[in-house]
Amino acid sequence: MSGTDLVSELSARFGDAVLGEQITRERFPTVWIRPEASAAVHRFLKHEVDRPFRMLVDLWAIDETARKHREGQPPSGITIASHLMSHERNADIRLKIALDAEYPSTKSIAGVFPNAAWYEREAYDMFGVEFELQPHSQRILLPPGWEGHPMRKTQPGRATERPLFNMTAALFDAKEHALAADPEKFGLPTHRDGVELMILNYGPHSMATHGVFRIVLALDGEEIVAARPDIGFHHRGAEKMAERQTWHSFLPYTDRVDYLGGVMGEMPYLQAVEKACGITVPDRALMVRVMLSEIFRIMNHLLFYGTMAQDTGAMSPVFYMFVDRERAYRVIESITGARMHPGFFRIGGLSMDLPQGWDGLVREFLDWMPSRLDDYEGMVLRNEIFRARTKGVGAYDTAMALDWGVTGPGLRATGYAWDVRKARPYAGFENFDFEIPVGVNGDCFDRTVVRVEEIRQSLKIIRQCVDNMPSGPIKADHPLTTPPPRERMLHDIETMIHHFVGASWGPVLPAGEYTGQVETVRGLTQFALISDGEPSSYRTRIRTPSFAHLQMISAVAPGMMVADLVAFLGSIDYVMSDVDR
């Protein structure tokens, strides 16, 4: 069934509750529906339609009050967009509902997609949208005492535009009280079978939480009865920053959304921007992008591997693996000039070509790693203590993973072979020979095994890049990306006219909506951009895998011991900047 057929089926089923399809350049349909039909339409798409849309990929809000180019769309002050995915169809659909700008309110869909709860809380936090029947209609990324909703167009984007902040003693006490682990506020039980439960703050300053993040636990002895993650301590307003940067100057920020993913964070953003501009990236630039992305995948997974072993009691592996990561960093630094945040990609290509001797450095690393991985298998994966601490711990099946929006190794560990690089190839991944590692039981052990095997597959991809690196340009010949060649500039001034605006204001993208999706180290990362025909983004929505994965803790943790929670958190492999943005 095509996207057009699906829209027709929705119209036949729900009548005038379906307002129509928005014309976009996306590969999936965007359908406007009435707010009162939202839950029913989402339920139909998840449970009743053929080859259903079982995953809510993302849900976000858009402040439409300052937007100039909305041709063909119904009037809306605040728009709620939800992005659904059908893995069986390998297809997506985006639903939109129009709300009033002054008092935006609609019904929650958390009863249909449980992972909608955090996304709806974020829409309330950032835009002030109230969701009826939402059990926790409270802030999620900002502190409880925050005034206003910062993603509204009436809110300033710079700290210098806000009143001077002064932390008085009274304000400090109020904020400290607001962050107390109140069971009622977090929806935690206080008793079980007549026994009073202990409420424990797990984090935010704990090595086991892998970042500034806490979980409020209700414990019966060492057993976890209920768990409520509390996030936002690392929030930096990445989506708001995008609205005051040009399309070019926002690129360095994408590296820092997942600060361990390196250049991989640039890929979905560039994918969307290049789609908007109609830019064809040269083959050499695409292959360099793939090679560097896979090197960063290896570096991330080595960090995961070592810290996962450390979390379960093995101290030595992490030190060996940091030696390997340092070798990889030398390769990255030699090619890009930086280590963690290269900012190496550009709209239409790369910032510079590969240096002389790059292939020798990469081959040396490729020859080094396989025997090291064999050694680590004995140290970690065949270690009886590690197996006892991880087998059968934190297990969930594919249906549960899809319900909670789990992607990447966390989904593949359940036995579901879904990888964006294979299902929806980008950057030339269709030309590479590699396998998708999968698990069986979906537990901590399988999540570790999947990532270890992904290291081997990434080595295989990188070797193909080295062996088959094409010659040619590293940037597209396009006025939004590259100045004309000097010989043409000196010939006549006309060659500079198209480049003038892009160089002075920043590139101007055609008005419209554009989406980029890639398989980053943690799973599906999606950038949904709105251009209003200006040098800056009107709305940049960043869907990160870690945000979805942490929400699942409340569903998986009950019944575990506290020590098992440490292993489970390590196996998720989240990064708090990826969660909080």
From Swiss-Prot:
SUPFAM superfamilies: HydB/Nqo4-like (SSF56762), Nqo5-like (SSF143243)
Disulfide pairings: none
Topology class, membrane: Peripheral membrane protein
Region NADH dehydrogenase I subunit D: start-end pairs: 196-581
EC number: 7.1.1.-
Keywords: Cell inner membrane, Cell membrane, Membrane, Multifunctional enzyme, NAD, Quinone, Translocase, Transport, Ubiquinone
Annotated stretches, region: NADH dehydrogenase I subunit C: 1-172
Listed InterPro entries: NADH_DH_suCD, NADH_Q_OxRdtase_suD, NADH_quin_OxRdtase_su_C/D-like, NADH_UbQ_OxRdtase_30kDa_su, NADH_UbQ_OxRdtase_49kDa_CS, NDH1_su_D/H, NiFe-Hase_large
UniProt catalytic activity: a quinone + NADH + 5 H(+)(in) = a quinol + NAD(+) + 4 H(+)(out)
GO molecular function, one term: quinone binding
Gene3D superfamilies tied to this protein: Cytochrome-c3 Hydrogenase, chain B (1.10.645.10), NADH:ubiquinone oxidoreductase, 30kDa subunit (3.30.460.80)
Domain of life: Bacteria
Family membership noted in the UniProt record: In the N-terminal section; belongs to the complex I 30 kDa subunit family.
Subunit and interaction comment: NDH-1 is composed of 13 different subunits. Subunits NuoB, CD, E, F, and G constitute the peripheral sector of the complex.
UniProt-listed NCBIfam families: NuoD, PRK06075.1, PRK11742.1
Function: NDH-1 shuttles electrons from NADH, via FMN and iron-sulfur (Fe-S) centers, to quinones in the respiratory chain. The immediate electron acceptor for the enzyme in this species is believed to be ubiquinone. Couples the redox reaction to proton translocation (for every two electrons transferred, four hydrogen ions are translocated across the cytoplasmic membrane), and thus conserves the redox energy in a proton gradient.
Listed name of the protein: NADH-quinone oxidoreductase subunit C/D
Organism the protein comes from: Rhodopseudomonas palustris (strain BisB5)
